[in-house]
Amino acid sequence: FSDGLADAGYVDGENIVIHQLSAAAEASNCPSIADTLINEKSDLILAVATPCASAVKEKTADIPVLFTAVTDPAGSGLVASNDAPGANLTGTSDMNPVAQQIALGKQLIPDAKKVAIMYCSSESNSKIQSDLAEAAIKEQGMESVVKTISAIDEAKSAIESLKGQVDFIYIPTDNTLADGMTTVSAAANECGIPTIVGESGMVGNQLLATASTTTNSAKQRLRWRSSSSRERQSLQACRSNTRQTKVFWRLPSIQKLLTS
């Protein structure tokens, strides 16, 4: 964003001042940050992720607000419509291909019958994805169980409660869980539960995989993070008229896990 402003001739420290504040992965910090930026009489506010955008929306109807990394702006109550936002807010959505991600889980674990959907109960963006995941799981002929947490320190016990109860876990683009993926992946690995996540930035540990979609391609391709050619053979590239799907995964022990 700062680079884009600079390209347009607005350079921090020269003709504009950019004040960056972080909520430090705590949604409860967002309202006070919004107050600070409004009290400074900011000319424009960029809000990253749904909790920040929601906090700013509650505080001002006058200052122009851009948001990004929001799953469903209209569904989260930020705008009247995703096609015509109206009011003082507009921005971009990072909606992930939930149905394709669930299908990926089914491809990796063909015998899967039950899937857990795990997210933080305070994040409306995650609830939207959870509803989509439930529908996708049903369409794949599987059963879903929803497991919510209110803080990352509940993740380990939540995952442990799923051991032996589900065939894999689906985690949407949930800010709380994304920030705590080290804890999540360690617990899932210890319990032997494969985990499908909402975006590639959450893939970095064992038992994690995702699929992401970009436009302007006539062919779907799959990209792997894997140490085994045998594992690579688990997925096949398929074709599409409009989109490119990339699969990011780090599942070095999935074949052993699924047969043990």
Go through the PLM ranges and name each one.
Residues F1-S260:
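Short hydrophobic alpha-helices and adjacent helix-cap/hinge residues
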